[in-house]
Amino acid sequence: MVKLGQLLASVPEVVAAAPWLAQESDRCPALGKIVTGLSTNSHACPPGTLFIGMPGTRVDGGEFWSGALEAGAIAAVVSEKALQKFPPQNGECVIAVPDLVPVCAGLAAAFYQHPAQTLQLVGVTGTNGKTTTSHLIEYFLNQQQRSSALLGTLYTRWPGYQKTATHTTPFATDLQKQLAEALQAGNQYAVMEVSSHALAQGRVLQCGFACAVFTNLTQDHLDFHGTMENYFAAKALLFKESYLQGRAVINQDDPYGQRLIDRLPLDQVYTYSVNDSTADFYTKDLDYQPTGVKGTFVTPQGEFPFLSPLVGQFNLANVLAAIASGLHLGLDPAAMVKDLLDFPGVPGRMEQVQIRPDQDISVMVDYAHTPDSLENALKAARPFIPGRLICIFGCGGDRDRTKRPLMGNIAAQLADLAVVTSDNPRTEDPEQILADVVQGISLDIEPWIIGDRATAIHKAIREAKPGDGVLIAGKGHEDYQILGTEKIHFDDREQAREALILRYS
């Protein structure tokens, strides 16, 4: 355990903002108290907590420092604006700093004894493919007895532990705590999905990465970043010296990936490509099959025939990224290729829903929720569907509106039947979201427009003809739907199973 004064003094930005900490301990008697935890939530401050009041997009959390202290916090670190607005009246220990982002990360890393300095971290960033790529890397590491934690969109997990995630990349206080717990559990590695939000908000400050992977960059999150250049700039932060301490693994087929490659020293980069033989890692002799892909990996350590259980070219790129990362981390490439055959897959990623051996239609659930990922999923499914390809999809509310007509156009062009439905409308009008999507669909194409997602899934599966394929896109692993401000239970896979049972009853 650490005393408050010692913890605060370990962060240079705090010392610079409050030099009196070193000389005037009587000004803040709490400096001698033991810190039992960190919290950015003023309502969750048990006795002994240090409250860190982070500014948000709508409100400055630091303005609630008094509530945090009343709840049990021994001190608060807040923004200068918050302290000016609500100055201490009774000698409370409240410290203002100009920029809370590095301070929060610094305090969290120090409190949890800098777990990232012991763990070997692998960071995976990109619009699409983060989850599958990170699962593959974690799988390859564990298969070769390199114990690894996984932190990402679905969960934080390691052998014997799993907890559902609330964010793709946790906030700094939670992230450092999870890394410390992973280290304490005996893990040597931690494979992390690193979102653009996390990079822009400094959540992964105090983390140095032995390997950083860039999968691709396509339109998403423009409600947050504003422009594609801002979005790219956020992703590119992972490849700065402050984060990248080892090798970058970059998709050469992506134009933004090529820009990253051009910025970095050649000996610090592994490039990969599905088709381009100038890359360090590429494939040849490909045979795309309904159950996966067969071919040959070409690597700096030789050629390896493979059979991957993951369908589609986009998944092949994810496998290449994982193989390249594993090779950099010292894994045996032949063993990785052998283990690939038994990779269990990722929940909600081109996940087949089948209730009987003689099922006469294919049903797949995928997380595709961007124009590029929807296109990839449809193209991956198309060759193996003898009948019609039916695509059920929607777009989330309170998110990037500009991608809605793009997704409508892609579904209409690549599927035989586009079924436009609700995703997570949140606080937007669901009918307006549907209208935005339909704007991208040519007038000579007639989509089904069914606002209720369960109804859309049941109707599509009920009316599918033998040989048809139904792709349910957008939610993947999610087991909820957000309507207004309410989160209700909803799972595309459960709905698909129910619809299939009714189809055959």
UniProtKB/Swiss-Prot annotation:
Modified residues (N6-carboxylysine): K235
InterPro entries assigned: Mur-like_cat_sf, Mur_ligase_C, Mur_ligase_C_dom_sf, Mur_ligase_cen, Mur_ligase_N, MurE/MurF_N, UDP-N-AcMur-Glu-dNH2Pim_ligase
Binding locations of ATP: G126, T127, N128, G129, K130, T131, T132
Processing and modification events after translation: Carboxylation is probably crucial for Mg(2+) binding and, consequently, for the gamma-phosphate positioning of ATP.
Main location: cytoplasm
EC number of the protein: 6.3.2.13
GO terms for cellular component: cytoplasm
GO biological process: cell division; cell wall organization; peptidoglycan biosynthetic process; regulation of cell shape
Alphabetized UniProt keyword annotations: ATP-binding, Cell cycle, Cell division, Cell shape, Cell wall biogenesis/degradation, Cytoplasm, Ligase, Magnesium, Nucleotide-binding, Peptidoglycan synthesis
SUPFAM superfamilies registered for this protein in UniProt: MurD-like peptide ligases, catalytic domain (SSF53623), MurD-like peptide ligases, peptide-binding domain (SSF53244), MurE/MurF N-terminal domain (SSF63418)
Cofactor entry: Mg(2+)
UniProt pathway annotation: Cell wall biogenesis; peptidoglycan biosynthesis
Entries under Gene3D superfamilies matching the protein: Mur ligase, C-terminal domain (3.90.190.20), Mur-like, catalytic domain (3.40.1190.10), MurE/MurF, N-terminal domain (3.40.1390.10)
HAMAP family, per the entry: MurE (MF_00208)
Name this polypeptide is given: UDP-N-acetylmuramoyl-L-alanyl-D-glutamate--2,6-diaminopimelate ligase
Species annotation: Synechocystis sp. (strain ATCC 27184 / PCC 6803 / Kazusa)
Gene, per the UniProt record: murE
